[in-house]
């Protein structure tokens, strides 16, 4: 049996704002350890026996960061499937199943969200091996987390009869929506309920057969999206029209609640979905006062709090049970019991057409990154870093001119028909409407300061004539 991890790396980046943003959601952030959650998930399965290289499903906007993070972790994926739009887990996994069937008709899928914490790797390995036994018998396995507290933020799985093959795995009696506190307390006391982890294992063929039975529109749309998709560099793009037409639904609703072959594998693995700042506090290391801190932080008389500084010193004095998260352009201060209201902050930013929910001041691109330094009426200043050997697209702007000053490194600059090399402390000017390109031909990062001036300075004022990353 060959088991293929399918890592779901979607997400909108709302619950852990201001650190998580739309273009940099939590799975791409180093929240708990030095590695990002995506990297931790990929590394978690890389050493397990019988597991193949992972297949990653992500959104189009995250593709280069996903590929770069996997490369940095030493992981070579089987493939990276690009969703043109988010359609929840059932279509994403259906697309992955069709892709895997073309590689291995007998493929078994281990479906894992990219943004979960699993502290006990040995227990996780044991749960995977038990699930594999259930899949051999035709079961569709879901991993049920042994509850430690009466959580109201998770759905639950009620176990049924023990299975003949293993008495530590069970039929699924029913799935239960997120309960109120009293119901959650009753579930905990009962002992027959598990948290619904959103992790699954099943044969690709079995999942598609059950999906065709219970959600045929999803099955057909996913099939078409894969078959009419195409390769793009190291990515596989799902057909946009077919996938956009696919109904949105979760695996639980589309398949698991209806199939007669659902089994639950209890897992006591130190699991958290890190769905809020309070959940992150729970899984982080604490000091003697119960505080989880990261960055340049000063605490005095603070207890049971999470304090995180990204760009400057943060001092907190004489408070308890709070969350303080500082970034370059936004700061969150909240009581630990109220962090779910962060989504209302994000909704407010959207309604005011602000950008702090979309991206940080540092924005990553496949060639490197840029960072906003200053902005005002008709001008904008950026710090641009280009990785060795990389180049920006050949482009032009209708509404702005640009001045470039090389801080360090060597720049190859195309401006119209002229190509020149610039070194440290040298500069150039790009007029409005002029074709231009910036490249780093050296072996060290290129750092430049860019001053834009003009009537409109939005990132959408760009016409690309040539791009090695095939962006439009």
Task: Locate the predicted segments by residue.
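Left-handed beta-helix
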Residues: 1-2, 205-405, 410-429, 436, ...
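A residue-level structural signature of the nucleotidyltransferase/glycosyltransferase Rossmann-like core
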Residues: 109, 173, 192, 199-200, ...
């Amino acid at each position: 049996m060959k088991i293929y991890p399918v890592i779901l790396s979607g997400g909108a980046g709302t619950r852990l704002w201001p650190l998580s943003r739309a273009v940099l959601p939590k799975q791409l952030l180093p929240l708990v350890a030095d590695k990002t959650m995506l990297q931790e998930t990929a590394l978690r399965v890389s050493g397990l026996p019988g597991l193949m290289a992972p297949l990653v499903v992500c959104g189009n906007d995250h593709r280069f960061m996903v590929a770069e993070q996997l490369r940095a972790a030493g992981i070579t994926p089987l493939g990276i499937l690009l969703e043109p739009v988010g359609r929840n887990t059932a279509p994403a996994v259906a697309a992955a199943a069709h892709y895997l069937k073309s590689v291995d008709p007998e493929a078994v899928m281990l479906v894992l969200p990219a943004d979960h914490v699993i502290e006990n790797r040995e227990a996780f390995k044991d749960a995977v091996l038990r699930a594999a036994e259930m899949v051999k018998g035709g079961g569709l396995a879901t991993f049920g987390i042994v509850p430690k507290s009466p959580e109201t933020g998770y759905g639950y799985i009620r176990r049924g009869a023990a299975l003949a093959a293993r008495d530590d795995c069970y039929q699924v009696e029913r799935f239960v929506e997120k309960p109120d506190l009293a119901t959650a307390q009753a579930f905990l006391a009962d002992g027959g309920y598990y948290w619904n982890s959103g992790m699954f294992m099943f044969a690709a063929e079995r999942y598609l057969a059950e999906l065709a039975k219970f959600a045929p529109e999803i099955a057909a749309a996913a099939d078409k999206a894969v078959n009419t998709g195409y390769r793009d560099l190291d990515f596989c793009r799902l057909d946009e029209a077919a996938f956009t037409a696919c109904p949105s639904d979760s695996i639980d609703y589309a398949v698991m609640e209806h199939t007669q072959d659902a089994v639950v594998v209890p897992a006591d693995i130190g699991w958290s979905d890190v769905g809020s700042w309070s959940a992150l506090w729970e899984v982080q290391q604490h000091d003697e006062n119960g505080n989880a801190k990261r960055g340049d932080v000063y605490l005095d008389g603070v207890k049971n709090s999470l304090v995180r500084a990204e760009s400057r010193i943060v001092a907190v004095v004489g408070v308890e049970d709070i969350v303080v998260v500082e970034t370059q352009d936004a700061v969150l201060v909240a009581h630990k019991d109220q962090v779910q209201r962060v989504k209302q902050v994000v909704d407010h930013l959207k309604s005011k057409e602000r950008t702090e929910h979309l991206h940080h001041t540092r924005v990553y691109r496949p060639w490197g990154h840029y960072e906003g330094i200053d902005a005002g009426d008709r001008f904008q200043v950026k710090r641009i870093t280009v990785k060795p050997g990389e180049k920006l697209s050949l482009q032009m702007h209708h509404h702005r001119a640009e001045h470039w000053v090389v801080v360090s490194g060597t720049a190859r600059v195309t401006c119209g028909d002229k190509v020149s090399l610039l070194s440290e402390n040298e500069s150039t000017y790009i007029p409005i409407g002029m074709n231009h390109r910036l490249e780093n031909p050296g072996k060290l990062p290129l750092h430049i300061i860019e001053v834009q001036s003009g009537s409109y300075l939005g990132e959408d004022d760009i016409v690309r004539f040539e791009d090695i990353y095939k962006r439009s």
